[in-house]
Amino acid sequence: MTRAISLYDVSKAYAKGVRVVDRLSLDIAPGEFLVLLGPSGCGKSTVLRMIAGLEEITDGQLLLDGEYGNDLPPSGRDMAMVFQNFALYPNMTSRDNIGFPLRIESPGADPAGRVDATARMLGIEDLLDRFPSQLSGGERQRVAMGRAISRHPSAFLMDEPLSNLDAKLRNHLRAEISKLTRELGVTTVYVTHDQSEAMSLGDRVAVLRGGVLQQVDTPRAVYALPRNVFVAAFIGTPRINLLRGLVRAPLDGAMTISLGKQFLRLPEPLSLDHQLLRVQQGREVIVGLRSEAVRIDPKFSASSRRTGAPAPAARPGEVAITGLVEHMEFQGHEVLVHFNTGSRPAVVPDLEAPRPTRRPIRRRRREGTVLNRLRDRAGALRAGPVVVLEHPAGPAPEPVAAPEPRLPGDLVVRTTPDIDLRHGMQVPLLVDIARLFVFDQRGERICPAPDRLPDLEE
């Protein structure tokens, strides 16, 4: 039997009232595969532990199949958890590790049949008599998954189970997990910071930032219609191009978005989404362009290709800009070209894990002799620099965002490897305005308009 899991305004606070999860509401349908996605420290593992009963819920309600579950002990929730570090007993063989929860559940029963059936399902029959120290990382994770599956739980909770494995093994096990959970039809909540895992595994993806739910939707919808600039920047490889823009909407002229040295002219007649941008006249916005929304002008491409094929015509709704080649990343089947268009990149904070900030020590005059003050100063010098994690009572200082490393160019474009490009070359580009995202200064999406979503073909 699989189960429904519902969270209503769930919060988790630790010492001094610091909230790591803030009023989270989620409904997970029976048999659904939901992925909790976000940067390190966003609270996704804490949510998983609250569902499992390993963390107390500070506020809000957890419902399991519609029944109040806040006070249920972990053993009464009928869930199985798969951990990042495998958590196998080193003095037990794989057979004993898989059968351990069955022996605890029914001490008098023989678990051999269920252990063998689980091993066949995972293809690990030849590993049953080995100890964890004799297994590779991928084999250990398969055994850990077998231990969870053998119980026939009503829900799987997986906390970054693939993060300790190499890339090739991650891809292989990702496919195995997807196939296995669909065959079993068990409700699965999967935590990861890897968007590739989230997009390939989940029926739905819930994006968290600082303990707050940003968006929950299908992988396709989260990519195609990010609710805010954080989701847009966190989802997608390469990362979406985010540029600062200024809306200009004169009554007697064409509507444009200035990017600094160049501008995007919105094609007429204006679409409904673009008409709604008129209210942003004279305001700064954030323009989002994914790498597939910009392409090299076909005329330039044709003259640069070794094939000499005729140039296709530009598509309706494309507008022209130019870019200077600053860097190229050869990927084999494609090339990611970094262009300098004279635009100002927009920075989205908290895309990675927050780190303690080094701050200068504020010295105050203290009472005492000159000798005492010199002794204190000598002690401070011996101790070295101090990392301040908490601030004394008083007005909170303004948050200081750590400067991001400067990347070459301000616009990344996908292209094919047969186009001859060189550093410093001026290249004509075409921007597909239909794929344009516009966010306001708070980071909320205003184009496409949030209350009128385009039709997404399944």
Locate each region found by the language model.
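ATP-binding/catalytic-site motifs of ATP-hydrolyzing domains
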Residues: Q61, E67, V212
